[in-house]
Amino acid sequence: KKSKSSFKPKIVPQNTNTEFLDGANKAYEMIVQAYQSNNIENVKDLLTPEALNAMVQAKAPKEIKFSEVKNSSILEDREEDSRLIKSVKFETEHYNVANNEILTVVEDWGFEKEKNTSDPNWKLFSIKLVS
């Protein structure tokens, strides 16, 4: 049963979180690869209009290439007004082709989705570089 009160914590079955993280990892890879190849419009359905605009204006460094997601975990899972929000910590590896180094990058990505929508996709709305 769904609680109508926004004050009660929502208990999410573990398999739902696993499924969400699998999708979030795929979205991360798709978004980063599209960004690095200056084709961010190809993944616009995975971004809020604000996130899309920010990524269109920013240019990815040519010497840094995405390698893999090493680890991901849900940091936050909340409801806010008519939205569901999940914050995911990504630990990833990128390759610096200029100096032949592997870089470890830690970022927190915020995904959102309208509560009462038939669209199963979550949209990226924020990125915070941790390290």
List the predicted regions and their residue ranges:
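Core segments of small alpha/beta cavity-forming domains
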Residues: 3-65
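Short, solvent-exposed beta-strand/turn "edge" segments of beta-rich domains on protein surfaces
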Residues: 18-21, 79, 98-99
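Generic detector of leucine side chains in alpha-helical contexts
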Residues: 21, 46-47, 52, 75, ...
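Generic signature of intrinsically disordered, low-complexity segments enriched in small/polar residues
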Residues: 23, 31, 38, 69, ...
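Intracellular C-terminal tails of type I single-pass membrane proteins
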Residues: 42-45, 58, 72, 110, ...
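A short linear-motif detector with a strong N-terminal bias
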Residues: 46, 51-55, 64-69, 87-91, ...
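A short, amphipathic edge element
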Residues: 60-79
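Exposed beta-sheet edge and beta->alpha loop/turn motif
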Residues: 81-131
